[in-house]
Amino acid sequence: MGRIGISCLFPASWHFSISPVGCPRILNTNLRQIVVISILAAAVSLLYFSVVIIRSKYGWLSKDKKFQRYLARVTDVEATDTNNPSVNYGIVVDCGSSGSRIFVYCWPRHNGNPHDLLDIRQMRDKNRKPVVMKIKPGISEFATSPEKVSDYISPLLSFAAEHVPRAKHKETPLYILCTAGMRVLPESQQKAILEDLLTDIPVHYDFLFSDSHAEVISGKQEGVYAWIGINFVLGRFEHIEEDDEAVVEVNIPGSESSEAIVRKRTAGVLDMGGVSTQIAYEVPQTVSFASSQQEEVAKNLLAEFNLGCDVHQTEHVYRVYVATFLGFGGNAARQRYEDRLFASTVQKNRLLGKQTGLTPDAPLLDPCLPLDIKDEIQQNGQTLYLQGTGDFDLCRETLQPFMNKTNETQTSLNGVYQPPIHFQNSEFYGFSEFYYCTEDVLRMGGDYNAARFTQAAKDYCATKWSILRERFDRGLYASHADLHRLKYQCFKSAWMFEVFHKGFSFPVTYKNLKTALQVYDKEVQWTLGAILYRTRFLPLRDIRQEVFRAGHAHWRGVSFVYNHYLFSGCFLVVLLSILLYLLRLRRIHRRAPRTGSLWMEEGLPSQKGPGPL
């Protein structure tokens, strides 16, 4: 076997020889194999550096979104860092009928993604308590003395000014939004109250407060804000794909000719207070109307709005139905029921010559009160004596006429228009009386089951009042349940059931109602939805800054990628040069005589083979 001699520029006395026997295997490969090995080496190098780049640039995107939301809820109960200059603040005053409450909210700098909303949370003080304050009476009490309104609301604003860092006052928006109490006032009195606020507040406080920041909002607006707040806390406005999240097809309002989009299913809201009942839910599909009159009514009940900061983007466009029914709250319904009971009994007694309910010994039997309980109704100086029979089914039957249902299609309470609900693909949260009726006494709040609720309500109604009192004294009911709750639990259970199933037409098999007092351990107010909607354009500034930073980051990223590719290219060139050099040596070796040898030794001429014998 021949030898290959390689000469290097080492000291003159250093010479060596290499035999193919001891060389790497690659010297015995053909050209095709060498090319394949080279390509594979280059591909492996490029793949390696691509993985490094992707992991370093996008590794955070692979984190579990559920864990992030859980972490956000945990940090949401921490005290707000008022020393952080990137934290922004906003203030909402809810001027209700019985009093006014101020809520201070805060949020970090927007992340620059135009698809995301502001991460607004309730501000918490050093003791981790929400920054909230309430005063009485309601602002409507100053209808005849509007000049005193600024003094009335001043304690609330001073309270907020103490918690919001002074350096942030001039950029902190203040919204004063008035609800039910102010709605019933004449427009002239409303205007006088608002003008006093707009005139005096800027003199004493540096908050961002313009003419549009003080107004009387409608029941429809209040319902929309409540719907926004609930769904924001539930994370339904985060348009990220998750396997276990329910989705719905949506025809974007104003783009009915376009193809439907698929996004997270939002939750509907049911709220039964003492005076009124309200329902709000998204209407994802384009609706049709039975008549032009119905269409005209629907315009006042459907709200179309864009929560996003870009009016040209449609992913945060929603069509929401909101209807409020005065007189359908739990206490107002009982009052209506008693009024009719009193009037009908007096009329029957007059016609039949009876004395039913006029004495304690001959009480009127009321199926909507617990068994054997005694109660009284007083009107116009007269007293009607009642005794409960605890008949839940009869109570429900008695209450059905109070729904004021009509035979017209797509209607609910009082014959009011109601768009179709996709019961198989929907979810509702029931608040206030929906929760109290299921939890305070029956202890079955949460996931609603009509059959279980009905049976529990029947058992409660049919239980003697003396036993119910004994259970109450032993503390077997919720801590905030009182004797008033125990007395009217039977009535309110039947009323809630009828409103939900007969009034709003939910089937008794419906499984997606959750009765709740809080969402993720937080009491969600409509004021959260109000500030989310009214500050929706604020992210534009941060988005522009993020785009500017992203441009520079892009060039840094390009430079980073370019350097890695340059290194890979240099590595490939060096590898190919070595291989080509070895190939050239091999070809030189093949052209040499097979029996010849190349010797390189110090100070000796090359040896020649012996001549022929």
Swiss-Prot record:
Glycans are attached at N404, N407. Its cofactor is Ca(2+); Mg(2+). The chain crosses the membrane at residues 34-54, 560-580. Coiled coil: none annotated. One of its GO terms (molecular function) is UDP phosphatase activity. Its EC number is 3.6.1.15, 3.6.1.6, 3.6.1.42. GO terms for biological process: CTP metabolic process; GDP catabolic process; nucleobase-containing small molecule catabolic process; UDP catabolic process. The keyword Magnesium applies. Disulfide bonds join C368-C395, C461-C490. Residues 55-559 are lumenal. The active site is at E222. Ubiquitous. CDD domains: ASKHA_NBD_NTPDase4-like. This is Ectonucleoside triphosphate diphosphohydrolase 4. It comes from Mus musculus. The gene is Entpd4.
